């Protein structure tokens, strides 16, 4: 359909959405393969905001979704998402002090379709280094989206926002919010 109507980007977005669906319902390995396949379609698509940064961000989100550390030793092009990825990568490298310093420099995420995902990446880093102020900010920013899947972008997810809120509540020693459906 995309080819027939000369809309090549439709195929890019449907491939990314398919990878997202696998990430939410399938095994981690299948989701990683789907994201890597979708990333190939970004090359030269004319959308630098997606081409630079999105592929490694999707893989990092998948690892956080499965409660696994960031990959290290890779020369990832984090693009505009580098500030949110850096603390998790440093933690995976065993560099807790550097991760805490990087976390202090993390800006507020842009108020866009990836805002919740970026907060869901910030939250476990804040928990890991015991940064209460950042945990409280993440909790306040994520609370309105408690019943949602993080990142309504159709491209990636870090899982249910409620799970991240539960983790934050446990770390902050406050009661979890009641589940909404």
Report residues per predicted region.
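Helix-coil-helix junctions within alpha-helical repeat/solenoid scaffolds
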Residues: 1-181
